[in-house]
Structures are given as C-alpha cells and as structure tokens.
Amino acid sequence: MEPSVEVAAVPTIEEEQPAPAPTIEIEETADIPDTPLAIEALRSRDYPASELIIEQTLDPGANYQRYIAYYSSDGFRIYGLLTVPDEAMPANGYPSILFLHGYIPPDTYVTTADYVATQDGLARNGFLTFKPDMRGHGRSEGEATGAHFSETYVVDSLNAFSALEI
C-alpha cells in the first residue's frame, strides 16, 4: 500500500488587469483669430513667380556683380539689392539666400547701405543673395506698414522667394 500524500490546494493567482487608460477631454480655451497672418490664410493664397528684373548695374564686389532689381508683389514693384557670383552658374543654380532683415524705418533705409557688409560676406563666398527693400522702403512701391504683424511684408517675402525660384 502506498502512502497517501496530502496535496495542499495550490492557490491560483488572479492576473491583474491593467486599469483602463484615463479619458482626456480637451476643451478649446481660445479661438484662433481669423487673421491674414494665420498659417491657413497664408497657405490659401497664391504667390505667383514674378521675374526678377535687373534695373541698374552697380559697382561690382570682389568676385560678384551687384544690381538693383525688382519683382512684383500684389501689383507693386518691390526693389532690392541682388548679388550674383562671377563664377559660372552650376547646373542646379547658384546657392541662394533671400536676405530678410529686421525693420528699418523707411525714412532712414538705403538699399545700397543697410546690411551691405553681411550681404558682401555671403556674396564673396559664392551665394547669390537678394535683399528686398520691403514695401514702402527705398524705391519699393506701396505703403510701409510697420515693424510688427505686417501681412504685406510676409506676402512680399513669399513672393520674393517665388521670384528667386524661377
């Protein structure tokens, strides 16, 4: 006869279920203003490529040419300082910089004087640069609209970018 062995009951382990993820409700606390500077508004516009027209040849730089050029933005001529390297243009075009600077009051702004040293440094290193005057500055047509939240300056900048792409 075999000895009997009493087997204790094996406790079962109940698997813990993860707690359900909390539901997060987001309430809008502020309305996005309907403004022409909103990304959605800017994306809804067209920025037609305008040809960049050279109007005046200036004295050359060390290894580049300098010009006063303009493009069209919302029916206005926007002038600026254009530098073009003397070297032959690469197959995919010159590396280009659209030089957008901070606000300078229109009554003191001079196309060929402001930021010239910076633009010269870029041009000496083989970059095509274009520094638009912005609306109402220098010889650019239209009205200067101030330093902050200017829809026209944003539009003029995007149109300048399109002009450089062609």
Regions found by a protein language model. Give the residues of each.
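Short beta-to-alpha linker loops that shape the active-site pocket of alpha/beta-hydrolase fold enzymes
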Residues: 86, 103, 133-137
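Loop/turn elements at helix/coil->beta-strand transitions in domains of secreted/extracellular proteins
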Residues: 77, 93-95, 125-129
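Glycine-rich "HGGG/HGxG" loop immediately N-terminal to the catalytic nucleophile
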Residues: 136-148
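Short amphipathic alpha-helix adjacent to the substrate-entry channel of hydrolases
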Residues: 111-131
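N-terminal cap/lid segment of alpha/beta-hydrolase-fold proteins
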Residues: 42-92
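Alpha/beta-hydrolase active-site loop
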Residues: 147-166
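Ser/Thr-rich, Proline-interspersed low-complexity disordered segments
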Residues: 1-35
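Short beta-strand element of the alpha/beta-hydrolase
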Residues: 91-104
